[in-house]
Amino acid sequence: HPTLRRQRQMCIRDRFFQEIIIFGFLLFILFTSNPFANIFPIPSEGTGLNPILQDPALAIHPPILYLGYVGTSIIFSSALGAIISGSINKSWASHIKRWVLISWVFLSIGILLGSIWAYYELGWGGFWFWDPVENVSLMPWLCLTALLHTVFTLEKRGTFQSWAIILSITTFSLSMSGTFLVRSGILNSIHTFANDPSRGVFILSLIHISEPTRQIR
């Protein structure tokens, strides 16, 4: 069936670009965060988890937030496939909208849980403190919200093709940029619990995968 064939072709293209992203992060783990690397000198006792992070909400807030970030990589991969194949149309919008919605839901829940935790954590300024790291998580959410409306419009009316692609790529780029800013130590934030400039530079190099945005006019 032609529709099933198109869906299969889109999935193959999406998977190709997604595998490139996964390979990049595997290199990141291997060269900067190897879990099997020896520690020398051997510490006599670990420092333990920061007391601020010893909260049940922190068992679900970061994973849910990062599930939203991971979803933006799938959207990004699909956008690249649509650019190369020239299939930025209603079928592509129908194909990608569920990933946009899933990512938006996870990112929304993650931000909400973080806000609730910040409310009862002493000295965090209420539900929203406009901390740099909080703002970093808000930017992809705003782009995802705009993309959600754009994709539904593209599916129904066949318009806003360029906006759908631009927002798809920008959302992923903002997620990567936010990760770089947090891990590199550039931002001075109350969220800064672990940073390493060398790891931040590696993440920054992965952001250049977004170069296809220059081809969009």
What are these regions (language model features)?
Residues F16-F28, T32, F36, F40-T47, ...:
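Acidic, glycine-enriched active-site microenvironments
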Residues H1-R8, I12, H208, P212-R217:
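Single conserved hydrophobic/aromatic residue that forms the stacking wall/gate
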Residues Y66-V70, E134, L138, L167, ...:
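Alpha-helical transmembrane segments
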Residues L112-W117, G125-F127, P132-S173, S177:
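Conserved active-site neighborhood of enzyme catalytic/cofactor-binding cores
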Residues E19-I29, T72-A82, W104-G114, L144-L147, ...:
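Helical transmembrane-bundle signal
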Residues Q9, N34-P62, I88, L113-V136, ...:
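Membrane-interface interhelical loops and short amphipathic "cap" helices
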Residues F36-A37, I42-P43, L67-G86, L144-H149, ...:
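Juxtamembrane interface elements at the cytosolic ends of transmembrane helices
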Residues R5, Q9, R13-F23, I84-V105, ...:
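Membrane-interfacial loop-to-helix junctions in multi-pass inner-membrane proteins
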